[in-house]
Design a protein with these regions (language model features):
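Gly/Pro-rich hinge or "lid" segments in bacterial periplasmic/extracellular proteins
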Residues: 3-6, 13-76, 80, 90, ...
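Beta->alpha turn/N-cap motifs
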Residues: 4-5, 89, 105-111, 158, ...
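Short, solvent-exposed loop/turn segments at the edges of secondary structure
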Residues: 46, 57-59, 76-78, 118, ...
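Append "and occasionally in soluble cytosolic enzymes with long acidic Gly/Pro-rich linkers
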Residues: 52, 65-66, 124, 144-233, ...
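Extracellular/periplasmic solute-recognition and catalytic clefts
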Residues: 54-65, 82-140, 150, 159, ...
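Short helices/loops that flank or line small-molecule/ion binding pockets
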Residues: 90-100, 117-118, 146-147, 229-238, ...
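Ligand-binding "clamshell"
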Residues: 113-125, 260-262, 275-290
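Extracytoplasmic/peripheral linker and loop segments enriched in polar/acidic and small residues
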Residues: 184, 223, 237, 241-258, ...
């Protein structure tokens, strides 16, 4: 039962967390709350979707085949899909260009223009309901001071990042919530190096002097390193601040943020439904995706 009307309820029900699961099958192999039980193995899993799981070889492939009991099986155009877990972006791109894969959702930035010219009918570039952002650990100096946090944000030339590093036609973000549908958020913080230097000086760090060593946490992907190095250069050029980059594999990266053992960290969020709330409620005090130590009572009252 809803506490109040929610216009985006139909959008939420499309999320995978709302998909029905077979209770009887789960209980045959353990308790409902147990993780990694045998009910998800190909020989045990019960599903009601377009495809059924036939093979799952860890770090090798996931194989699905058309579900003969699917209600609309006549309109399913392919017999199956083989998913390949490829960790190296360039390896995946090479496999696609060599004809070893039919579909890839990623392209190395330096290969985007090549792909557009060589395979114009195969490349699709569509807007995504997502935002890249940087987390600041507000429990650790110097980011306890909002002037420092804003200064670091104002020192980022977003358009330069898009043009010279990302190269995928992204749009500069004016805030955490991206534009979509008829929703057009106001720009809260943009590129303003002079304003950034002024704020940093007001906080007691003119030209970056007196700042403790700042570590920028990111993942171990090749593109993550390039993004981090671009930010590192901007903060040096626009604030006079030296940043140390620390790359970690995904699990360690997430754990380190949960433990708030970082200064700055690369982040991003893909909206789960078409409403600003999907980008805002993660910043509640006890939100599992907050990971910054930040909270604001007035903000939470407005959300509720």
């Amino acid at each position: 039962k809803l506490n109040s009307p929610i216009a985006f309820l139909p959008e939420i029900t499309k999320h995978y967390t709302w998909f029905p699961v077979p209770k009887h099958s789960i209980l045959e192999h353990g308790r409902i709350g147990d993780r990694f039980t045998a009910w998800t193995k190909p020989e045990n899993i019960v599903s009601n979707g377009t495809f059924i799981l036939t093979s799952w070889q860890f770090n090798d492939h996931i194989q699905v085949e058309r579900n003969p009991l699917y209600w609309d099986k006549g309109n399913v155009g392919i017999n199956g899909i083989r998913y390949l877990p490829i960790s190296n972006l360039y390896t995946e791109d090479r496999m696609y260009f060599d004809g070893q894969m039919h579909i890839t959702y990623t392209l190395a930035p330096e290969l985007i223009e090549y792909a557009r010219e060589r395979y114009p009918n195969q490349v699709r570039n569509e807007l995504y309901l997502g935002t890249y952002f940087i987390r600041a650990n507000v429990t650790r100096e110097p980011f306890t001071d909002p002037r420092v946090r804003i200064a670091f944000s104002k020192a980022i030339d977003q358009q330069s990042m898009i043009t010279n590093v990302l190269k995928g036609g992204q749009k500069p973000a004016g805030g955490l919530v991206p534009p979509f549908g008829d929703y057009r958020p106001a720009t809260t913080i943009g590129f303003d190096p002079e304003g950034a230097r002024k704020l940093l000086a007001e906080a007691g760090y003119p030209g970056g002097k007196g700042l403790p060593e700042i570590e920028f946490l990111t993942t171990d992907k090749e593109t993550s390193k390039a993004n981090a190095e671009a930010l590192q250069a901007m903060w040096k050029d626009n604030l006079g601040v030296s940043i140390r980059i620390k790359q970690m594999e995904w699990t360690s990266y997430i754990t380190t943020m949960f433990e708030k053992d970082y200064g700055l960290a690369a982040g991003g969020w893909i909206g789960d439904y078409m409403d600003p709330l999907t980008f805002l409620d993660m910043w509640m005090k006890d939100g599992g995706n907050n990971r910054t130590g930040w909270h604001n009572e007035q903000f939470e009252v407005l959300l509720k």
